Structures are given as structure tokens and as C-alpha cells.
């Protein structure tokens, strides 16, 4: 039995310069694993709690209350004591021991960031001890599918200080034959988009996830730029066929929702400030009008997927949205389901979505994440493994995407090392598994008819 000999946590910084937690685990046989926990900007209300130092003894003089020293202390003084001497290969048992120590529904006692850091580092230490890569340890011999990347080339919402209310405008290289080719396609489109934005007088500053963050007058203008960039790069803006590149949107609509009304707040502010080029236009929508708005976008642009098109509390709206468009489009739940198997079960029963976004830190352990993915796949749902806006050099999600044959991954644009690190890891995995590697492209959408 390979026993854990040491667990050590420390405070480090994420891609926004905010504190996060890094955990290292060592075993008696020489295994070692290290993990850095990500952090989100637009978060679901039912996510597991990310423990920060606000309200603790650290608040007044440590990162303005955003520090994670409390979570670090919980790892070093509580979790480490509990888990030392236990077999590193028993992931589920160790995860359950931490959950029993915490004793809360949302992991607020120890902090989901503390628990997840340990859970991830344990998995990596186990893989290291067995001398196998993480994707093979988590997925076994069946781990072979490289994910179609959703590349967030235009940022908005909480991820950028611009005028776009929708959070992410993404491209999906569906016509590529391999993951490496998909990145080559994306690279060409990304740099073509930069030239088009410059030519139109826009800056090419980037948002939290590495995509451009121009001050555009509407979501349609952002989509027009994407279509033009795809075409000028030599590809087809389409959801299927040769050289097809489709578009995906993350509306992050919970950020826009209040008292039953969706408001494009950034656009509204730009109009009220009478900024140049911003003409009066509609900025408020009911649920039914939002669904109709997406219908207009679907009819006009090659959009294949929408994430959080409605607010997390608008369950009836999600059901209507999926009834209307779920047979032809991927309707992804993120804030709605927060990688929680219990909530996903409710969504499956109500037929509220047909796809789920998977974020490790929304639920807080490797075991619970795998349970949610398994439930989604059994229900015939697609799964999208996702980063957070606050990231690091940690590449765990790349291995996870291959381990569970998720088929899709969201990990930002083709800039910022914290995003590129995941793509580079996937390139290495594709090379390592060579002839058994699969990239499904448009076939990844097995549960819809385009």
C-alpha cells in the first residue's frame, strides 16, 4: 500500500494576480503531485464555496481580504493530519474523508479550494507513483478522444472591460481532422481577427481569457467580425462539412438577470453616456424575448452551442429554450448546474439542457466531478470541460478532458500562457497516444441534428 507521507499547501497567484492555493502531495514510495486551484469571475450561486480571508484574522492586511491563508491553514493543519498515512491510490475514499471532515453542503468549513487542491494533488501523486500520465490514471485504457476546442477569441461580460454583455464569443474548428490541425485553424483565424479589428479602428487588448476585448456596438457586430475572420482565413463559417468552423456563445445570462428581466447593462451604459457610434436600441428582454433573440442569432450565424443563455434561476425558461432549440443546438448548463450531480439530475428530469459544463472547482473534488460526468454521459448529454477566468500554469483540465472522452474543452484563446499551457498539454497527449487518438470534429454533437 502506497501511503501519503506529506501534504503541503501554500498561497500563490492566479492569472489575475489574485491569491489562490497550491497543494503538493508526496508518498512514501516517491510519488509527487502538485495542483493549483482556479477561480471564477462569474459564478453560480450554488457553487461550492471558495474560502477567502475576508472576515478572518488575515483580512485587514493580506490582499484586501482576498487571500487564501485560511484555506492554506486548513490544508496544512487539518486535512494533512487526517490523510497522512492513507493509501494515495484510493481517490474516492480520500475525497470522502475530506467531505466528512468538512460536514457542509457547500464545503464552506474547509473551503472548496482547499479540498480541491488536495484532491487534485492526490490524483497526480498517484499517477506519478504508478509512472503513468494523469489522463491514463483517471480514464484507463479507454482514454483516447482529443477534445474539440472552444476558443474564446472575443471576450465580454465579467471577463473584459468593454461594451459586450455576452461573456464569450468562441470558434470551434469542426472540420479539422486532428487536435493539432484544429489549433492551426484557430491560430489563423485568431490572427486574421486581430488584423480586422485593427483595420476597423479597434484595439486588440485582451480580456481575462486571452480573447480580444473591443468596444463593439452589439453582439451581432462581434459575430460579424468572427464570420469575416473565418472566411478571410480561408475556412467556412458553418456547423458541418469540409473546413467548417462553427461559433459558440457563453451569454453568462445570470449576470444580466434581475426581477424577471434581462438587461444588456454594458450596452445600456454606453448608450446613456452617448458614446460615439452607440445609437439607442433595445437593451431589455423578457425570458421569451431572450429565447426569440437567440433564435434570430441562430438563423443569422453558424452558432452551434449556447452556454447559460438564460439565468440560473430561470428554470422554466431553460426548459422552453431547450424544447425550442435543443434538437438542433447544444444548450449548455453552467451556472444552472455547477458540476453538481444532484442539480444535473434535476435538469435531466426537467429536460432543461442537453449539455453540461464541467468545472472542477464548482463541486470541489475529483470524485464528485467524475460522478457528474458519468451521469451526464448516461443521460446522453455532451460534456464540456472548462477552465475558469482566473487560471494558472496548471494543466489538469487537459488530462481530464481526455480521461473522460469529454469531446469538448473551453480553455480560452490563443494568448496568455495560462491558456496556452492547456493547449500545449493536449498537443503532447495527442502525440503520446498517436494512432489511437481521435478528434471527432462535428461528430462530437452526437445528440443533436444540425
UniProtKB/Swiss-Prot annotation:
Textual note on the cofactor: Binds a second Mg(2+) ion via substrate during catalysis.
InterPro entries recorded: Enolase, Enolase-like_C_sf, Enolase-like_N, Enolase_C, Enolase_CS, Enolase_N
Subcellular localization(s) per the UniProt record: Cytoplasm; Secreted; Cell surface
Pfam families: Enolase_C, Enolase_N
Pathway(s) of this molecule: Carbohydrate degradation; glycolysis; pyruvate from D-glyceraldehyde 3-phosphate: step 4/5
Organism domain of life: Bacteria
E.C. number(s) listed in UniProt: 4.2.1.11
Active-site residue numbers: 209, 359
GO molecular function: magnesium ion binding; phosphopyruvate hydratase activity
One Gene Ontology cellular component annotation held by this UniProt entry: extracellular region
Cofactor(s), by name: Mg(2+)
Residues engaged in binding Mg(2+): 250, 307, 334
Reactions catalysed, as given in the entry: (2R)-2-phosphoglycerate = phosphoenolpyruvate + H2O
Keyword Magnesium attributed: yes
Keywords annotated in UniProt: Cell adhesion, Cytoplasm, Glycolysis, Lyase, Magnesium, Metal-binding, Secreted, Virulence
Residues forming coiled coils: none
Binding locations of (2R)-2-phosphoglycerate: 167, 359, 388-389, 410
Biological process per Gene Ontology, one example term: cell adhesion
Similarity remark: Belongs to the enolase family.
Protein function: Catalyzes the reversible conversion of 2-phosphoglycerate (2-PG) into phosphoenolpyruvate (PEP). It is essential for the degradation of carbohydrates via glycolysis. 'Moonlights' as a plasminogen receptor and plasmin activator. Contributes to host (pig) cell adhesion; anti-enolase antibodies decrease binding to porcine kidney cells about 60%. Binds host plasminogen and fibronectin in vitro; enhances the activity of host tissue-specific plasminogen activator (tPA), and helps plasminogen and tPA degrade articifial host extracellular matrices.
Misc: Pathogens have evolved a strategy to activate host plasminogen and manipulate plasmin activity for their benefit; plasminogen binding (even without its activation to plasmin) increases their adherence to host cells. Plasmin activity leads to degradation of host extracellular matrix proteins like collagen, fibronectin and laminin, facilitating bacterial dissemination and disease spread. Enolase is not the only protein in this bacterium that binds plasminogen.
HAMAP family cross-referenced by the UniProt entry: Enolase
Name recorded for this polypeptide: Enolase
Gene this protein is translated from: eno
Amino acid at each position: 500500500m502506497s501511503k501519503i507521507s506529506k501534504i503541503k499547501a501554500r498561497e500563490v497567484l492566479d492569472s489575475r494576480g489574485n491569491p489562490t492555493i497550491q497543494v503538493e502531495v508526496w508518498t512514501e514510495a516517491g510519488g509527487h503531485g502538485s495542483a493549483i486551484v482556479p477561480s471564477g469571475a462569474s459564478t453560480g450561486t450554488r457553487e461550492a464555496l471558495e474560502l477567502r480571508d475576508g472576515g478572518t484574522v488575515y483580512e485587514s492586511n493580506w490582499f484586501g481580504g482576498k487571500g487564501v491563508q485560511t484555506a492554506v491553514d486548513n490544508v496544512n493543519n487539518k486535512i494533512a493530519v487526517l490523510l497522512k498515512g492513507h493509501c494515495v491510490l484510493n481517490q474516492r475514499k480520500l475525497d470522502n474523508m475530506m467531505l466528512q471532515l468538512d460536514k457542509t453542503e457547500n464545503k464552506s468549513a474547509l473551503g472548496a479550494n482547499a479540498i480541491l487542491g488536495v484532491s487534485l494533488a492526490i490524483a497526480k501523486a498517484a499517477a506519478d507513483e504508478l509512472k503513468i500520465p494523469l489522463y491514463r490514471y483517471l480514464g484507463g485504457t479507454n482514454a483516447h478522444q482529443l477534445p474539440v476546442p472552444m476558443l474564446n477569441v472575443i471576450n465580454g461580460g465579467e471577463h473584459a472591460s468593454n461594451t459586450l454583455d455576452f461573456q464569450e464569443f468562441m470558434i470551434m474548428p469542426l472540420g479539422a481532422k486532428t487536435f493539432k490541425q484544429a489549433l492551426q485553424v484557430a491560430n489563423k483565424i485568431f490572427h486574421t481577427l486581430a488584423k480586422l479589428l485593427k483595420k476597423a479602428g479597434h484595439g486588440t487588448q485582451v480580456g481575462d481569457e486571452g480573447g480580444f476585448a473591443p468596444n463593439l456596438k452589439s453582439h451581432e457586430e462581434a459575430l460579424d467580425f468572427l464570420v469575416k475572420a473565418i472566411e478571410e482565413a480561408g475556412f467556412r463559417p458553418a456547423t458541418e462539412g469540409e473546413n467548417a468552423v462553427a461559433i459558440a456563445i457563453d451569454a453568462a445570462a445570470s449576470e444580466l438577470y434581475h426581477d424577471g428581466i434581462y438587461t444588456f447593462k454594458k450596452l445600456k451604459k454606453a448608450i446613456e453616456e452617448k458614446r460615439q457610434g452607440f445609437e439607442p436600441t433595445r437593451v431589455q428582454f423578457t425570458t421569451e424575448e431572450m429565447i426569440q433573440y437567440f433564435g434570430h442569432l441562430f438563423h443569422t450565424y453558424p452558432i452551434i452551442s449556447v452556454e447559460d443563455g438564460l439565468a440560473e434561476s430561470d428554470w422554466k425558461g431553460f426548459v422552453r429554450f431547450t424544447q425550442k432549440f435543443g434538437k438542433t443546438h447544444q444548450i449548455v448548463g453552467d451556472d444552472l448546474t455547477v458540476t453538481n450531480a444532484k442539480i444535473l439530475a434535476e435538469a435531466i428530469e426537467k429536460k432543461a439542457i442537453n449539455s453540461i459544463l464541467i468545472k472542477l472547482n464548482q463541486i470541489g473534488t475529483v470524485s464528485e466531478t467524475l460522478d457528474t460526468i458519468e451521469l451526464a454521459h448516461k443521460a446522453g448529454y455532451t460534456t464540456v470541460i472548462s477552465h475558469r477566468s482566473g487560471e494558472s500554469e496548471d494543466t489538469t483540465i487537459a488530462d481530464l478532458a481526455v480521461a473522460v472522452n469529454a469531446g469538448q474543452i473551453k480553455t480560452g484563446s490563443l494568448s496568455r500562457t495560462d491558456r496556452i499551457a492547456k493547449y500545449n498539454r493536449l498537443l503532447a497527449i495527442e502525440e503520446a497516444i498517436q494512432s489511437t487518438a481521435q478528434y471527432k470534429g462535428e461528430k462530437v454533437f452526437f445528440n443533436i441534428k444540425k
